[in-house]
Swiss-Prot record:
Gene Ontology process terms (BP): carbohydrate metabolic process; pentose-phosphate shunt
Highest rank taxon of the organism: Bacteria
EC number, as in UniProt: 2.2.1.2
Protein name per UniProt: Transaldolase
PANTHER family for the chain: TRANSALDOLASE
Similarity section: Belongs to the transaldolase family. Type 1 subfamily.
Pathway, per record: Carbohydrate degradation; pentose phosphate pathway; D-glyceraldehyde 3-phosphate and beta-D-fructose 6-phosphate from D-ribose 5-phosphate and D-xylulose 5-phosphate (non-oxidative stage): step 2/3
Organism annotation: Vibrio vulnificus (strain CMCP6)
Catalyzed reactions per annotation: D-sedoheptulose 7-phosphate + D-glyceraldehyde 3-phosphate = D-erythrose 4-phosphate + beta-D-fructose 6-phosphate
Complex and partners: Homodimer.
Intrachain S-S bonds: none
Location of the protein in the cell: Cytoplasm
Length: 316
């Protein structure tokens, strides 16, 4: 019998949640996802030093203002890392918009267009890029605009059913509902561990997946943020799963049958009317876990973006 990673690939598109080229070469995923924390981690790897230098040189040709140079360097570094990753995968790279723009629709759209132009100028076409945005109301509205321009989006930091519904109604390409961070919250709240089949994060993604398939939404469901392989295996059959290298290694080392847990019902039920902003806020705020985790996720990504900028500033 083949290992669990090989079996999972037959049921689900496996994506690598890393900015590290060596890990991507090893596990040969279809796609790869990055975020500000992963870019910061990758930027500290010696082999990426030339990419940082090239990004700084680019920024110096764009502006004499140091603050602008820092911004341009960070953007180009994310794109340069993305370009390197794209050499090793057949699919798409997800590159994230600055988390500090999470409540700024116009700013998010402008930053997304800028990142896509950087990729396009390097010969990378839109069908190989996903722009990551936080699943705030403003992020979802930004994605709605970008999708109409042919820029596909990956809506991340998704913790509530309201966020998932709003993303589908906006016609976004893909969502990344988080699993492990949901479980973390309930574990801290209830002071206990959860078996995979009762894991609140697993149950959340399962509910979203089934809802999308029941109503025939085309938005791709990509489970993210896993704490153990039990969570991953409970979501076998999900459209895509983005998995960190350490868990890919565990799956590769594990033997035993992988059972399909999520099955596309191929439904065509009449869809409910799209949520208004007020309805979205009301529904999202009924879920204290989602409120806390969305805010925390945005803050943490912003902190790592700041650390990256400080690192770049020291090199300018």
């Amino acid at each position: 019998m083949s290992n669990k990673l090989e079996q999972l690939r037959k049921l689900t598109t496996v994506v690598a949640d890393t900015g590290e080229i060596d890990a991507i070469k090893k596990y040969q995923p279809e796609d790869a996802t990055t975020n500000p924390s992963l870019i910061l981690k990758a930027a500290q790897i010696a082999e990426y030093a030339p990419l940082i230098d090239a990004s700084i040189e680019y920024a110096k040709t764009q502006s004499d203002d140091k603050a602008q140079q820092i911004q341009d360097t960070c953007d180009m570094l994310a794109v340069n890392i993305g370009k390197e990753i794209l050499k090793t995968i057949p699919g798409r790279i997800s590159t994230e918009v600055d988390a500090r723009l999470s409540y700024d629709m116009e700013g998010s759209v402008a930053k997304a267009r800028q990142l896509v132009k950087m990729y396009n100028d390097a010969g990378i076409t839109n069908d190989r890029i996903l722009i990551k945005l936080a699943s705030t109301w403003e992020g979802i509205r930004a994605a709605e605009i970008l999708e109409k321009e042919g820029i596909n989006c990956n809506l991340t930091l998704l913790f509530s059913f309201a966020q998932a519904r709003a993303c589908a109604e906006a016609g976004v390409f893909l969502i990344s509902p988080f699993v492990g961070r949901i479980m973390d919250w309930y574990k801290a709240k209830e002071g206990r561990d959860f078996e995979a089949q009762e894991d609140p994060g697993v149950l959340s993604v399962t509910k979203i997946y089934n809802y999308y398939k029941e109503y025939g939404y085309k938005t791709v469901v990509m489970g993210a943020s896993f704490r153990n392989i039990g969570e991953i295996l409970e979501l076998a059959g999900c459209d895509r799963l983005t998995i960190a290298p350490a868990l890919l290694a565990e799956l590769e080392a594990a033997e035993g049958e992988v059972v399909e847990k999520l099955v596309d019902s191929k439904g065509a039920a009449e869809r409910p009317a799209a949520m208004t902003h007020a309805e979205f806020l009301w529904e999202h705020n009924q879920d204290p876990m989602a409120v806390e985790k969305l805010a925390e996720g945005i803050r943490n990504f912003a902190v790592d973006q700041g650390k990256l900028e400080a690192m770049i500033a020291a090199k300018l």
